[in-house]
């Protein structure tokens, strides 16, 4: 029997009783998050769908070797659980990342995400034109250039001009990935090239990140 255990579980067999308990304790790794009222979460083949007052978000987690389920606890509250077997350190980190994505999806369909960006310039004022559809922005006169920069927003995002603060725009949406990617594309369209960036600080930068205060 000892020979069989040594061949099948060599690392466990050589450990002390306390180490065997730790190994058995980490045999199954489970994390969970609560689902608030008014939000519906469904899972099908590791494709998570979250529905809330602001809309619906869908994300595919098939690349993660995990069991994602929607269950109810002893108090009758709904929660999403993510479970892994024989999980190592990196796999446990990936599982917590999946749960963070689901939390962001729940926040997106209940509150929404809002990023604010400011225009920074020294000599040439940056002019921005936002159409009524609020699905793109046209940037003009950056560093005095005549070229017009057209930046479309990601799906589900809208851009508006902040009338309370000068040279500030607001990007809103339910998906934090799409909102942040829209800001990154605006920032990337106004990069200073072939100049000393320590001296030429012109550009459009993210000044504030958060959620939409007025819930729908």
Describe every region a protein language model picked out.
Residues 2-216:
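Ribosome-associated RNA-binding proteins
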